[in-house]
A protein has these predicted regions:
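Conserved active-site segments centered on acidic
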Residues: 1-86, 159-169
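Phosphate-binding/catalytic loops
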Residues: 89, 95-169
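Helix N-cap/beta->alpha junction signal
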Residues: 20, 94-95
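Hydrophobic structural packing positions in well-ordered secondary structure
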Residues: 13, 64, 91-92, 149
Length: 169
């Protein structure tokens, strides 16, 4: 019998080619390293339709690879109405994404929609609450984004482990 995944997480940014696929890959590795891949389903999506079907931005993929994360199997897609029923958590990168996702959400949805950096200890210290879009910037922006995402996804996994995982195993 195949064990059904009991928690699901969708990471969302604007185009689904930089921030959300990075979060997807980083969190997927954290989940795998903790032996929780059979419990947690992970995906990513965007609120804009410019890049549907395309792989992540080369700079995101290269930066992620430097740190041991693999984005090669990911392809951009749009947030869909069904995501609000299929995902327990929808974690967005910035306040514009948060507004856009909330506007798309059906009134009776069950998903918890919030900023990814709500789970980052570092962001509270540095007063950073959004993952900035590195698309139009230089290489340093991709480093910064990866560091923010690593901290927040580890914090989110700690939150899940403390509040849900023991009940689901």
């Amino acid at each position: 019998m195949i064990k059904q995944k009991k928690l699901s997480v969708l990471f969302v940014c604007l185009g689904n080619i930089c921030r959300s696929p990075t979060a997807h890959a980083v969190f997927r590795k954290c989940v795998s390293d903790n032996g929780l891949s059979d419990i947690i389903n992970i995906d990513s999506a965007g609120t804009g339709d410019w890049h549907i079907g395309r792989p992540p931005d080369r700079r995101s993929s290269e930066k992620a690879k430097e740190f041991g994360y693999d984005l090669s199997d990911l392809r951009a897609r749009l947030v869909e109405t069904s995501d609000f029923e299929n995902f327990s958590y929808i974690l967005v990168m910035d306040s514009k994404n948060l507004d856009d996702v909330r506007k798309l959400a059906p009134k009776d949805h069950k998903a918890k929609i919030e900023l990814l950096l709500n789970y980052s200890a570092r962001s509270r210290v540095d007063n950073i609450y959004e993952v900035p879009d590195p698309y139009f910037g230089g290489e340093d922006g991709f480093d910064h984004v990866l560091n923010l995402i690593e901290d927040a996804t580890l914090g989110f996994l700690d939150y899940l482990k403390a509040n849900y995982i023991s009940e689901l195993e």
